[in-house]
């Protein structure tokens, strides 16, 4: 994900450094709550993600949405920087590069879709002894809900951000 994001920044930086900086800021704001939730839910591997729903269903849904936002799926926040970059490339008459970037972003989308599929649609074989993880109350930082909302639903603020 970060490697793909660096590619987007490298392409747009010579044309518009402001868009590149906005891209990294949005990416950081999306990554922080994602990693924070993964740490709280003790998720390290794809195998851990198959049983994430047993720890906290709500946190699992939020993590799934944040993964989709990181992938750049519209209408989530992660789509905004890609849209701005593609727009800048087209305005600079670099349509072939914009097309190539858009097509290559499908690889990143595939990775995140596979991860969200594993998290939401599959269950590993279980025995009655290990059917459910212990449900300890997860204590989240008070800032986490705000960060989650910011990482998912900032696209309506895009016109205001780009005019600054």
Language model features by range: what are they?
Residues 1-164:
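Core, highly hydrophobic multi-pass alpha-helical transmembrane subunits of bioenergetic inner membranes
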């Amino acid at each position: 994900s970060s490697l793909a994001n660096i590619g987007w920044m490298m392409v747009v930086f010579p044309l518009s450094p402001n868009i590149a900086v906005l891209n990294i800021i949005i990416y950081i704001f999306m990554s922080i709550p994602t990693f924070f939730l993964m740490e709280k839910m003790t998720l390290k591997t794809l195998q851990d993600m198959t049983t994430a729903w047993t720890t906290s269903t709500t946190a699992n849904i939020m993590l799934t949405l944040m993964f989709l936002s990181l992938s750049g799926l519209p209408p989530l926040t992660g789509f905004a920087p890609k849209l701005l970059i593609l727009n800048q490339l087209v305005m600079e008459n670099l349509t072939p590069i914009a097309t190539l970037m858009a097509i290559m972003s499908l690889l990143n989308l595939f990775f995140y879709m596979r991860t969200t599929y594993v998290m939401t649609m599959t269950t590993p074989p279980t025995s009655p002894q290990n059917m459910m993880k212990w449900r300890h109350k997860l204590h989240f930082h008070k800032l986490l809900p705000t960060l989650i909302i910011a990482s998912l639903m900032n696209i309506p603020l895009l016109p205001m951000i780009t005019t600054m």
